[in-house]
């Protein structure tokens, strides 16, 4: 097995649990954002919208639920509130622990912008349906009355150098934008499927196939090129 193939397989293994070992930064989890303007802090910072996804014991993660949330909940809210968002990304994790399977929308905004986004998410009919059916067991929002992550590096991995912590969010946003647009493109091809959950099962399968066949060149190769094709140390 050549070195390039070994590195690719290692990357796939590292991603299998969706950052299972790394819990996202914690904030105050709320069922809904406060509605009064007096409750909102001044300034900007990072905000999380966390969607806790049902995972029956002994079953693998239902990754397509996160993809459904991305396509039907996050995308329309983002389109309506892009002016409130400086930088953003999505995050997944599905560890076999108490925290469980969580899909997160993470964005840098003013507290007032976060309040508007949270209020819009709460009203999303697809999210309401997922919660009613038990597919999403809980939604967690941060408290817009206080800003706990004001710096651009505040949601990056503390094990990284400060320069990487400060610049990595741009890479994560680009990858998240590519993924979200890809989900939208693929979902349009399955528009004839009336059952929403089945549609996104098919979307997830198609996205998996695209990633498996094209991710090495479209993503890994070109990122490697940006960094001058230098050796990469991978540890696990």
Task: Give residue spans per PLM region.
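An acidic, charge-biased composition feature
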Residues: 16-236
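N-terminal export leaders
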Residues: 4-9
């Amino acid at each position: 097995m050549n070195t390039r193939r070994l590195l690719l397989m290692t990357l796939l293994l590292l991603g299998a649990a969706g950052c299972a070992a790394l819990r996202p930064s914690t904030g105050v989890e709320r069922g809904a954002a406060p509605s009064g303007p007096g409750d909102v802090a001044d300034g900007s910072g990072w905000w999380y919208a966390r969607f806790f996804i049902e995972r029956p014991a002994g079953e693998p993660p239902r990754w397509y639920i996160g993809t459904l949330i991305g396509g039907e909940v996050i995308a329309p809210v983002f389109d309506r509130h892009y002016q409130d968002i400086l930088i953003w990304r999505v995050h997944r994790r599905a560890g076999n622990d108490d925290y469980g399977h969580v899909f997160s929308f993470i964005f840098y905004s003013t507290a007032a912008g976060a309040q508007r986004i949270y209020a819009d998410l709460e009203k999303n009919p697809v999210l309401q349906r997922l919660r009613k059916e038990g597919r999403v067991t809980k939604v967690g929002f941060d408290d817009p009355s206080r800003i706990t992550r004001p710096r651009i590096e505040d949601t990056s991995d503390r094990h990284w150098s400060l320069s990487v912590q400060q610049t990595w969010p741009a890479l994560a946003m680009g990858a998240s934008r590519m993924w979200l647009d890809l989900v939208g493109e693929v979902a349009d091809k399955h528009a004839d499927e009336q059952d929403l959950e089945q549609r996104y099962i098919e979307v997830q399968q198609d996205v998996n196939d695209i990633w498996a066949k094209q991710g090495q060149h479209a993503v890994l190769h070109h990122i490697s090129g940006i960094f001058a094709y230098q050796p990469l140390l991978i540890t696990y």
